[in-house]
C-alpha cells in the first residue's frame, strides 16, 4: 500500500486558507510556493479550504496553519484539532497579518461606510476564544503582537514580516542616476474602502465624501499641482480616486487586479515614486510595511506617512512624510528625492533593506522563519488513529 509517510517523518503542513485577498497571497500562497520548490527544508505545504483528517494525511502532518480564523466554523475546527494535537504530534499555528481586532476601542476606520459593525466585534470574540489553543500566532509587526497579547495574555505571538517574491517582481534593478530628476512617474494606490465618495444615505440624504488616508497630508493638492505643472505623471491604481475627478483626463487609472498579477503590473509601471499615505490611527498601526518593500524591490523611492508605531518607520529618512504635511512640503520631499545623490542612496538603502533583513520570499532567512513555526522533523512517528 502506498504510504505518504517518508524518511522525513511528518513532511506536510496544511495551510487552511480562504479568500483571494492580498493578505492570503503574501502570507500563504507566495511562501508556500517558495517552500515547496526548494524541497530542501523538510516540509511540503498543502493549501486546503478545511483540514484534511484522513488518518494517512493526518499522521504525515507536522503542522496546521490557519489564515485569520475568526468565526464559529473556524473555532469548531480549531477546538477539534487542539484536542488531538499532542497525541497526533502536530503544531497549531494561526496567522493574523493586519486583522482588524478590538484594540483600545473600535479599530474600524472612521470613514468606512459600515463603521464598527457587529460582524467585526463577533470576529474579535472568536479570536479571543481561539488564541490560547494555538502553539504560535504569527503577526506582521511588533505593535500588533504587543497589543494582541495584552488582550489574550497567551504569550504565543511571533512576528513574521511580509516578504516580496522576487520571481514575480521581475523588474530589473534600475541603474544609478547620472543627473537630477525633474519629472517623476508617481503611483498611488490603496483600498477603495478606505475612502468614501459623496453619496446618499439610506434615507436619501446627501453624505459628504471622506478622504480616508489621503487626509493625512495635502496629498491630493500635491498631486493636482504636480500634474498641472507637468512634473508628475500620475497613475492611480485600484480604480478611480473620487478626489481626482477634475483631473481624470490627465492621469492614468488602473483597475484592481488579482494579487498574482499585481507584482508584474507594478513592476512594468517603472514608477519613480510610490505614495503611501496613512492617517495615524490604531488600524494603520496594525498594518505591515508591504508598500515599502514593494517599492524597494521595484527600485522605486517612496513617500510614506510616518508616526509612532507606524509601519514605515524603517523607511529612509528622506522618504518620511509627517502627519499634516502641506503640498509644498510634499513637493520639497519629491524634489529632494530627485537629487541624484539622494536618489541613488535611497534606492540602495531600499535594496539593502530587503536583502539584509530577509524580506525576499525565497531567501533562506525568510524560509527559515516558516520552518521554525512548523517545528523540527520528528525522530520517530507514532501513528495516530483519529477514529
Q: How would you describe each model-predicted region?
A:
Residues 1-74, 106, 201, 384-387:
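N-terminal pre-catalytic "stem/leader" segment of glycosyltransferase-like enzymes
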Residues 19-37, 162-268:
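Conserved catalytic-core segment of nucleotide-activated headgroup transferases in glycan assembly
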Residues 83-84, 102, 115-137, 151:
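Membrane-proximal helix-turn-helix segments that form the acceptor-binding/catalytic region
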Residues 85-119:
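Active-site proximal beta-strand in glycosyltransferases
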Residues 135-149, 153-170:
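Donor nucleotide-sugar binding/catalytic pocket of nucleotide-sugar-dependent glycosyltransferases
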Residues 210, 260, 264-294, 303-314:
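Nucleotide-sugar-dependent
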Residues 338-386:
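A charged, aromatic-enriched C-terminal amphipathic alpha-helix characteristic of glycosyltransferases
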Amino acid at each position: 500500500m502506498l504510504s505518504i509517510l517518508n524518511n522525513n517523518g511528518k513532511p506536510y503542513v496544511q495551510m487552511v486558507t480562504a479568500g483571494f485577498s492580498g493578505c492570503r497571497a503574501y502570507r500563504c500562497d507566495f511562501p508556500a510556493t517558495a517552500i515547496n520548490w526548494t524541497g530542501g527544508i523538510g516540509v511540503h505545504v498543502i493549501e486546503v479550504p478545511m483540514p484534511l483528517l484522513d488518518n494517512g494525511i493526518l499522521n504525515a502532518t507536522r503542522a496546521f496553519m490557519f489564515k485569520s480564523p475568526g468565526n464559529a466554523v473556524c473555532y469548531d475546527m480549531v477546538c477539534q484539532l487542539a484536542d488531538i494535537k499532542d497525541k497526533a504530534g502536530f503544531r497549531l499555528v494561526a496567522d493574523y497579518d493586519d486583522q482588524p481586532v478590538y484594540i483600545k476601542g473600535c479599530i474600524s476606520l472612521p470613514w468606512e461606510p459600515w463603521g464598527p459593525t457587529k460582524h467585526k466585534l463577533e470576529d474579535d470574540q472568536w479570536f479571543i476564544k481561539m488564541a490560547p489553543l494555538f502553539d504560535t500566532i504569527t503577526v506582521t509587526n511588533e505593535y500588533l503582537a504587543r497589543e494582541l497579547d495584552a488582550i489574550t495574555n497567551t504569550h504565543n505571538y511571533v512576528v513574521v514580516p511580509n516578504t516580496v517574491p522576487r520571481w514575480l517582481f521581475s523588474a530589473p534593478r534600475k541603474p544609478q542616476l547620472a543627473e537630477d530628476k525633474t519629472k517623476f512617474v508617481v503611483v498611488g494606490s490603496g483600498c477603495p474602502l478606505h475612502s468614501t465618495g459623496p453619496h446618499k444615505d439610506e434615507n436619501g440624504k446627501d453624505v459628504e465624501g471622506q478622504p480616508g488616508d489621503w487626509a493625512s497630508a495635502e496629498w491630493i493638492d500635491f498631486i493636482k499641482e504636480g500634474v498641472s505643472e507637468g512634473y508628475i505623471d500620475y497613475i492611480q491604481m485600484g480604480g478611480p480616486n473620487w478626489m481626482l475627478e477634475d483631473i481624470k483626463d490627465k492621469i492614468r487609472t488602473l483597475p484592481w487586479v488579482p494579487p498574482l498579477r499585481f507584482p508584474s503590473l507594478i513592476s512594468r509601471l517603472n514608477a519613480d515614486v510610490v505614495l503611501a499615505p496613512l492617517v495615524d490611527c490604531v488600524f494603520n498601526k496594525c498594518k505591515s510595511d508591504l508598500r515599502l518593500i514593494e517599492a524597494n524591490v521595484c527600485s522605486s523611492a517612496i513617500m510614506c506617512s510616518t508616526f509612532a508605531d507606524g509601519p514605515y518607520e524603517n523607511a529612509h529618512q528622506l522618504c518620511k512624510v509627517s502627519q499634516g504635511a502641506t503640498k509644498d512640503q510634499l513637493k520639497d520631499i519629491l524634489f529632494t528625492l530627485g537629487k541624484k545623490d539622494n536618489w541613488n542612496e535611497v534606492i540602495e538603502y531600499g535594496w539593502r533593506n530587503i536583502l539584509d533583513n530577509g524580506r525576499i520570499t525565497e531567501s533562506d532567512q525568510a524560509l527559515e522563519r516558516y520552518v521554525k513555526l512548523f517545528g523540527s522533523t520528528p525522530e520517530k512517528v507514532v501513528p495516530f488513529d483519529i477514529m
